[in-house]
Amino acid sequence: MAADDVCRTEGFVEKRIRDMPDDDTIMELSDLFKLFGDSTRLRILLALKDGGMCVDTLSSVVGVSVSAVSHQLKSLKTANLVRSRRDGKWVHYELCDEHVEALLSIAMEHLREGPE
């Protein structure tokens, strides 16, 4: 369908408006994507993509202090992107579910494709 056809299709704009998420959902999506906008948080998520680890190990992998990793993990946990589980004196962090991994994988695939 050509661009002119879309602009002239009766009801097109109204349907698109109806299909748009509500303002609260848009704000939640905006907040979610903001979390991916921080390079340290993004490194943490990518490090956890292949399995969980404790804060000390994450700190070494990501290359920032333990306190910086802990601070970012708190934000990621609040946003339901990571979860923790205690194993004795250690706390292991992992991605919450396959949706988080899928978001990361799709973004990486998009980057690899480059411009069209």
PLM regions and their residue ranges:
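Short, hydrophobic-biased segments on the C-terminal half of alpha helices
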Residues: 73-74
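Beta-hairpin "wing" of winged helix-turn-helix
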Residues: 77-87, 94
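N-terminal leader segment of winged-helix/HTH proteins
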Residues: 1-36
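N-terminal helix-turn-helix DNA-binding core of bacterial DNA-binding proteins
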Residues: 23-67, 91-98
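Short, solvent-exposed amphipathic helices
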Residues: 99-113
